[in-house]
Amino acid sequence: KETAAAKFERQHMDPAPAAAXXQNYCNQMM
């Protein structure tokens, strides 16, 4: 299973729509 950090990195390297989800995830983390 992926760690949160690995998932975070992968999402940021993916094209949309994953990018949109990553943005949401980022905002929650900040």
UniProtKB/Swiss-Prot annotation:
Tissue distribution of the protein: Pancreas.
Regions of compositional bias (Basic and acidic residues) in chain numbering: 1-13
GO terms for cellular component: extracellular region
InterPro entries hit by this protein: RNaseA-like_dom_sf
Reactions that this protein is recorded to catalyse: an [RNA] containing cytidine + H2O = an [RNA]-3'-cytidine-3'-phosphate + a 5'-hydroxy-ribonucleotide-3'-[RNA]; an [RNA] containing uridine + H2O = an [RNA]-3'-uridine-3'-phosphate + a 5'-hydroxy-ribonucleotide-3'-[RNA]
Catalytic residues of the enzyme: H12 (proton acceptor)
Residues that coordinate or bind substrate: K7, R10
Record's function text: Endonuclease that catalyzes the cleavage of RNA on the 3' side of pyrimidine nucleotides. Acts on single-stranded and double-stranded RNA.
Subunit organization: Monomer. Interacts with and forms tight 1:1 complexes with RNH1. Dimerization of two such complexes may occur. Interaction with RNH1 inhibits this protein.
Family note: Belongs to the pancreatic ribonuclease family.
Name assigned to this protein: Ribonuclease pancreatic
Species, as recorded: Odocoileus virginianus virginianus (Virginia white-tailed deer)
Organism lineage string: Eukaryota, Metazoa, Chordata, Craniata, Vertebrata
